[in-house]
Amino acid sequence: QHLADYDEVDDDRAKLHLDAR
């Protein structure tokens, strides 16, 4: 599972992506 490894990064990037969009 990639998300498991990038759980924290995904959460941080997810917010940035949503904000950017």
Swiss-Prot record:
<keyword id="KW-0399">Innate immunity</keyword>
<keyword id="KW-1064">Adaptive immunity</keyword>
<dbReference type="GO" id="GO:0002250">
    <property type="term" value="P:adaptive immune response"/>
</dbReference>
<dbReference type="GO" id="GO:0007596">
    <property type="term" value="P:blood coagulation"/>
</dbReference>
<feature type="modified residue" description="Pyrrolidone carboxylic acid">
    <location>
        <position position="1"/>
    </location>
</feature>
<comment type="function">
    <text>Cleaved by the protease thrombin to yield monomers which, together with fibrinogen alpha (FGA) and fibrinogen gamma (FGG), polymerize to form an insoluble fibrin matrix. Fibrin has a major function in hemostasis as one of the primary components of blood clots. In addition, functions during the early stages of wound repair to stabilize the lesion and guide cell migration during re-epithelialization. Was originally thought to be essential for platelet aggregation, based on in vitro studies using anticoagulated blood.</text>
</comment>
<keyword id="KW-0391">Immunity</keyword>
<protein>
    <recommendedName>
        <fullName>Fibrinogen beta chain</fullName>
    </recommendedName>
</protein>
<keyword id="KW-0094">Blood coagulation</keyword>
<keyword id="KW-0873">Pyrrolidone carboxylic acid</keyword>
<dbReference type="GO" id="GO:0045087">
    <property type="term" value="P:innate immune response"/>
</dbReference>
<feature type="modified residue" description="Sulfotyrosine">
    <location>
        <position position="6"/>
    </location>
</feature>
<dbReference type="GO" id="GO:0005576">
    <property type="term" value="C:extracellular region"/>
</dbReference>
<comment type="subunit">
    <text>Heterohexamer; disulfide linked. Contains 2 sets of 3 non-identical chains (alpha, beta and gamma). The 2 heterotrimers are in head to head conformation with the N-termini in a small central domain.</text>
</comment>
<keyword id="KW-0765">Sulfation</keyword>
<keyword id="KW-0175">Coiled coil</keyword>
<keyword id="KW-1015">Disulfide bond</keyword>
<keyword id="KW-0964">Secreted</keyword>
<keyword id="KW-0356">Hemostasis</keyword>
